[in-house]
């Protein structure tokens, strides 16, 4: 009887044997970090969301001004909750008393020290894809805040930029349309119709090939399924 060879690796941080999925995630992240650094991003990998919260929080000094886009990732992982417990100037539009105050916070975010968000998709070679309805998120990613930190679960990784765009349009956008109960064709059947609906949330398609200036953007890859 031939013996089965089982691949395993020891995690020196957690002092336990890594699962095959954890091994795959780490190897994928290592490859992507190299590609992102070639594109002038700063990049790290966190196996868990809890570790990512600690790492991102450590990047932000007390007294900093911080804002974020409408990201389920950073909310669900507890990052915004952790930041609310610190001595920071938080520009949180969810706390706005009315629409006018929310609009003011949108604009103040462009002067923030740190802007936090996720992405709809990222290719294995490091191109980040986002689709926006209002454009405030992709605008802040592109220009304004001193530092942008993008927290991206490995569930959003696609083989190449075309697959990343397809994921953003066919997975993230229909789910977000359902989340906001927006009356678009994709809300009805879960499929992108490349529509021009008045309520479309796919008005701005953004590809980020490089971080400019170098190091302005930090990508935190997380070995968990986060966001849409």
Where are these regions (language model features)?
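N-terminal start-of-chain detector that recognizes signal peptides
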Residues: 15-18, 37-40, 87-90, 101-103, ...
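Flexible, glycine/proline-enriched loop segments at strand-loop-helix junctions
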Residues: 19-20, 94-96, 148-155
